[in-house]
UniProtKB/Swiss-Prot annotation:
The lineage of its organism: Bacteria, Pseudomonadati, Pseudomonadota, Alphaproteobacteria, Acetobacterales. It catalyses: UTP + L-glutamine + ATP + H2O = CTP + L-glutamate + ADP + phosphate + 2 H(+); L-glutamine + H2O = L-glutamate + NH4(+); UTP + NH4(+) + ATP = CTP + ADP + phosphate + 2 H(+). PROSITE patterns: GATASE_TYPE_1. This is CTP synthase. It comes from Granulibacter bethesdensis (strain ATCC BAA-1260 / CGDNIH1). Disulfide bonds: none annotated. It is an enzyme of class 6 (ligase). L-glutamine binds at residues 54, 354, 382-385, 405, 471. Its EC number is 6.3.4.2. One of its GO terms (biological process) is pyrimidine nucleobase biosynthetic process.
């Protein structure tokens, strides 16, 4: 029998509902329960795939090829449970499905309305594809209570609470308790008003997570409990912490997991085993050294655009017991003369994914600096493509080498995937048409060449499964020319058609991959490429 915990937010956005949901999932796992986390997003986009990184942050890709909210990355990293397409639903997707059903005549001529048709579709998104033996489904509702676009979602979960009853549903509300320096006290009024807003749509929260920069005194907790109609023990101080990997420990100390079990009349038993959480938090707080890695990107004004990437570097640091200090560098600055000197002193250079011509030449210059100065390098997706173009121009004597993404070119080292096969289904794509649904998405295999750095880094396995998100591929027809100048194609699709990994044998550590390894990295299971990259940076820093 699956129990549902709904997590909502109030007062302001970006309070950390995703981290709170993931931390609760980790605590329940530590007590022996199975969990699955889901996110309902109120925006009208069908998915975040075509949204600007400046608007939404990164797009998290699942094994089954869904482009989802970045919070699903937190869910995976904290619980180790791989997300699926069904774990993220948006208003756009819900409305698209309902309208498609109306066009097919599924509603038999009925007037299609928000209630019951949209709310029924939302309830289906909450409950479908869940294993019958799943203990807990944690459902995060995006947005802030009081937003117009959130109302259908709140109504749907209110109905589920009524239909399933309190024995199977719980409502957790994340709110803000700000400290006002001039008054010298915490203010509870925003929380009171936020809860009232939630009560106005028929939802009584069972627990309050109160974001604050200091512990809430007992008298203030009592006051919040009184005004918001919750148990005092269910008013949890969600304190600011120095690392997100301390959040499960902090919430446990505040009694969050015990209160959830009490609500569902489940045995609390002994203490959960949080040893591994304490161990990684200790490494993050007290590392053996520091390495500096430059991320040369084009969306650095919103760091959420690279959320999984930054976390994967933290994981690589944990594996090597060092702190990774990230130097965020706008790739466009390298399009100016002598600006690559900005990279002197870093112990590693990472060129991440991206789309479009803006900043591409700067990324190519960053690749060249890493190659010529023997600085450890990791290129991801677009970053690998820029590494191949750099080799073609500066080593293979192909100065006109470029990508057709930037326009027609004489030497299309990188080109649009006009067709490719997955299983027995041949899919065709063209440069014209809608952008949505035109990429190679999800998990695909890569065969690793024996004796390569890539295969060694992966522990000697011959084939790996990695997540992809790209429209363009390195042109395999240039393989011979590029390998002749030292750029080895060390990973290919099993049919040998699509280049997946490139590297230099005469470089301390230089790897470019067409996929996104950061999407599979976890604090307790760092991705081998990030462990290896950070280890190379440690050697570069002369720490070992």
């Amino acid at each position: 029998m699956t129990r549902f915990v709904f997590i909502t937010g109030g007062v302001v956005s970006s309070l950390g509902k995703g981290i709170a949901s993931a931390a609760l999932g980790a605590l329940l796992q530590a007590r022996g329960y199975s969990v699955r986390l889901r996110k309902l997003d109120p925006y009208l986009n069908v998915d975040p795939g075509t949204m600007s990184p400046y608007q939404h942050g990164e797009v998290f890709v699942t094994d089954d090829g869904a482009e989802t909210d970045l919070d699903l990355g937190h869910y995976e990293r904290f619980t180790g449970v791989h997300a699926r397409k069904s774990d993220n639903a948006t208003t756009g997707r819900i409305y698209s499905d309902v309208i498609a059903r109306e066009r097919r005549g599924d509603y038999l001529g009925a007037t299609v309305q928000v209630i019951p048709h949209i709310t029924d579709a939302i309830k289906d998104a909450v409950t479908r594809d869940l294993n019958q033996d799943l203990d807990f489904a944690l459902i995060e509702i995006g947005g802030t209570v009081g937003d117009i676009e959130s109302l259908p979602f709140l109504e749907a979960i209110r109905q589920l609470g009524n239909e399933l009853g309190p024995s199977r549903t719980m409502f957790v509300h994340l709110t803000l308790v700000p400290y006002i320096p001039s008054a010298g006290e915490l203010k509870t009024k925003p929380t009171q008003h936020s809860v009232k807003e939630l009560q106005n749509v028929g939802i009584q929260p069972n627990m309050l997570l109160c974001r604050c920069d200091r512990l809430i005194p007992e008298n203030e907790r009592r006051k919040i409990a009184n005004f918001c109609n919750v148990r005092q023990e269910a008013v949890v101080s969600a304190l600011d912490v120095d690392t997100i990997y301390s959040v499960p420990i902090r919430y446990h100390e505040e009694g969050m997991d015990r209160e959830v079990l009490r609500h569902f009349n489940l045995p609390i038993g002994g203490e959960p085993d949080l040893t591994r959480w304490r161990e990684i938090a200790d490494v993050v707080r007290a590392p053996d050294g520091v390495v500096k890695i430059a991320i040369v990107g084009k969306y650095i004004t919103l760091l959420d655009s690279y959320k999984s990437l930054a976390e994967a570097l933290v994981h690589g640091g944990i594996a090597n017991r060092v702190k990774v200090e990230i130097d965020w560098v706008d790739s466009q600055i390298f399009e100016q003369a002598d600006s690559v000197q900005r990279l002197e002193g870093v112990h590693g250079i990472l060129v991440p994914g991206g789309f479009g011509e803006r900043g591409a030449e700067g990324k190519i210059e960053a690749v060249r600096f890493a190659r010529e100065h023997k600085v450890p390098f990791l290129g991801i997706c677009f970053g690998m493509q820029m590494a191949v173009i750099e080799a073609a121009r500066n080593l293979a004597g192909l100065p006109d080498a470029s990508s057709t993404e930037f326009g027609p070119c004489e030497v299309p080292i990188v080109g649009l995937m006009t067709e490719w096969a997955r299983g027995n289904d041949l899919e065709r794509r063209s440069a014209s048409g809608d952008l949505g649904g035109t990429m190679r998405l999800g998990s695909y295999p890569a065969a690793l060449i024996e004796g390569s750095l890539a295969r060694e880094t992966y522990g000697g396995v011959p084939v790996v499964q990695e997540r992809h998100r790209h429209r363009y591929e390195v042109n395999i027809h240039y393989r011979e020319q590029l390998e002749a100048v030292g750029l080895r194609f060390s990973g290919l699709s099993p049919d040998g058609v699509l280049p997946e990994i490139v590297e230099y044998a005469d470089h301390p550590w230089f790897v470019g991959v067409q996929y996104h390894p950061e999407l599979k990295s976890k604090p307790f299971d760092p991705h081998p490429l990030f462990s290896g990259f950070v280890a190379a940076a440690v050697r570069q820093a002369r720490l070992v």
